[in-house]
Swiss-Prot record:
Keyword Ribonucleoprotein: yes
Biological classification of the source: Bacteria, Pseudomonadati, Pseudomonadota, Alphaproteobacteria, Candidatus Pelagibacterales
Organism of derivation: Pelagibacter ubique (strain HTCC1062)
Name of protein: Large ribosomal subunit protein bL27
NCBIfam families named in the record: L27
Region (Disordered): 1-21
GO cellular component, one term: ribosome
Length: 84
């Protein structure tokens, strides 16, 4: 009798949900204190004036104003908030 053992189940077939990272408020947009401007892993974008950085590297506004992105030294991108 020809027999065959049961085939193993696939080890693939799962995927984690996206983490919803990235820029949340773009240049020129008006923000209020506490608004998250960028969600990121590590410092892809650095904090400039009138913004804070959380322990997960999220950048948020500390004043009301407009978002400004700027290139700094050694190709670093900074985000600031220009008060109204």
């Amino acid at each position: 009798m020809a027999t065959k053992k049961a085939g193993g189940s696939s080890r693939n077939g799962r995927d984690s949900a996206g983490r919803r990272l990235g820029v949340k408020k773009y240049g020129g947009e008006v923000v209020i204190p506490g608004n998250i401007i960028v969600r990121q892993r590590g410092t892809k974008i650095f904090p400039g004036e009138n913004v804070g950085m959380g322990k997960d590297h999220s950048i948020f506004s500390v004043v009301e104003g407009k978002v400004v992105f700027k290139k700094g030294k050694s190709d670093r991108t900074f985000v600031s908030v220009k008060p109204n």
